[in-house]
């Protein structure tokens, strides 16, 4: 089974002490402040054969998300909604401990957090993906690939997922004697998205809380908490990872910081998506 870099004790004690000594001065190895995000770039329509796609670079972390739409049956418990299926893969080329094969528990956890953030925020209006109530709907396959693991992959996965959804084309549906079929020659619009959503992760290293940890920082962190926000700053997801603990004061401070960062991140995301 693959293991995430943060599970590997690869940072020598002397290097950890060096990193923490920088935290004491309010700075980090790459020159960022403790509350700074790494540079973000988004390339839309990166995978030309997908219905929508986006390549996200967050520092050295690189994630590609792509969508495919197909006509499908609705789930029995949601006959008047389309379907959203999120998959995440940690490709072996992304990090030395990632192995080929089916998604492991780390990839499954990432997919669940991204899925939950999208659903609970109602970013995608599934009710508008119905073709024939109770019989035919659109299924949106959202596949996310981690190409380079440079730390804080969850935030990058959320950004790539949202960007790919906004980039997705919806094709004309035609009906004949055999039922519904997709006419790929005619685009009728985009997915019915209500708003974007972002995830902001805060790592705790000793007594310090740091935004958007890179690979070295994740390797020495005690724990990490991630908050997902809508543009009105409603929390639509919280995820804790790592073996360490956080006090209520830590969580409160982390959320206050994440909220401020989310405002800037949402502005940057909207700017790069042109929405």
Curated annotation (Swiss-Prot):
Belongs to the RNase PH family. Rrp42 subfamily. The gene is rrp42. It is found in: Cytoplasm. One of its GO terms (cellular component) is cytoplasmic exosome (RNase complex). One of its GO terms (biological process) is rRNA catabolic process. Non-catalytic component of the exosome, which is a complex involved in RNA degradation. Contributes to the structuring of the Rrp41 active site. Its main location: cytoplasm. The keyword DNA-binding does not apply. NCBIfam families: PRK04282.1-1. GO terms for molecular function: mRNA 3'-UTR AU-rich region binding. The keyword DNA damage does not apply. This is Exosome complex component Rrp42. Component of the archaeal exosome complex. Forms a hexameric ring-like arrangement composed of 3 Rrp41-Rrp42 heterodimers. The hexameric ring associates with a trimer of Rrp4 and/or Csl4 subunits. InterPro entries: ExoRNase_PH_dom1, ExoRNase_PH_dom2, ExoRNase_PH_dom2_sf, Exosome_comp_Rrp42_subfam, PNPase/RNase_PH_dom_sf, Ribosomal_Su5_D2-typ_SF, Rrp42_archaea. Keywords: Cytoplasm, Exosome.
């Amino acid at each position: 089974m693959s293991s995430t870099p943060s599970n590997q004790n690869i940072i020598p004690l002397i290097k950890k002490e060096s990193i923490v000594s920088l935290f004491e001065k309010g700075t980090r190895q790459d020159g960022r402040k403790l509350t700074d995000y790494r540079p973000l770039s988004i390339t839309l329509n990166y995978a030309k054969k997908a219905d929508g796609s986006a390549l996200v670079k967050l520092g050295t972390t690189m994630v590609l998300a792509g969508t495919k739409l197909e006509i499908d049956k609705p789930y029995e418990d949601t006959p008047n909604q389309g379907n959203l299926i999120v998959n995440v893969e940690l490709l072996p080329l992304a990090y030395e401990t990632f192995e080929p094969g089916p998604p492991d528990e780390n990839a499954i956890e990432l997919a669940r957090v991204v899925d939950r953030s999208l659903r609970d925020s109602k970013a995608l209006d599934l009710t508008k993906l119905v073709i024939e109530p109770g019989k035919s709907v659109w299924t949106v396959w959202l596949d996310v690939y981690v190409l380079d693991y440079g730390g804080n992959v969850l935030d990058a996965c959320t950004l790539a997922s949202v960007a790919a959804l906004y980039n997705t084309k919806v094709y004309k549906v035609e009906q004949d004697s055999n039922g519904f079929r997709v006419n790929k020659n005619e685009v009728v619009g985009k997915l019915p998205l209500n708003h974007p959503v972002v995830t902001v992760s805060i790592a705790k290293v000793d007594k310090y809380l740091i935004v958007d940890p890179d690979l070295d920082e994740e390797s020495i962190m005690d724990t990490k908490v991630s908050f997902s926000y809508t543009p009105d700053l409603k929390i639509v997801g919280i995820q804790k990872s790592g073996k360490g603990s956080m006090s209520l004061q830590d969580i409160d401070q982390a959320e206050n910081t994440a909220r401020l960062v989310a405002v800037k991140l949402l502005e940057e995301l909207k700017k790069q998506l042109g929405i």
